[in-house]
Amino acid sequence: MSHLCSLHITTTLSGIRVNKVLIDGGAAISLLPERMLRKVGKHPDDLVPTNIVVTDFSGTSTPARGLVTLTVKVGSSERNTVFVVVPSRASYNALLGRDWIHGVGAVPFAVH
């Protein structure tokens, strides 16, 4: 396997099994494509309003639809995580960013 391949896992989001979850240490926040909202048992009315604008790697900016908190379970680790919900056609079903990675202690964090 190439070291340049992305890391996709299968996890549980608020009790729902979800595959193609991307772990991305380059992302400051965790993202949930809007199309996944109902699949994890949530409704657009559950979103907390936000002024966050997400900018992707190409520089395109998209206003977030809102925030939703989901319980993320990976192995024996379980943590409530705030996801920024965005309109997206991404190939992943959820993205776990540095907020989640460091929150579960998956990678030690050091400021240089």
Predicted segments, located by residue:
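Charged, flexible boundary elements
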Residues: 1-10
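Aspartic protease core domain of the pepsin/retropepsin superfamily
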Residues: 17, 25, 29-112
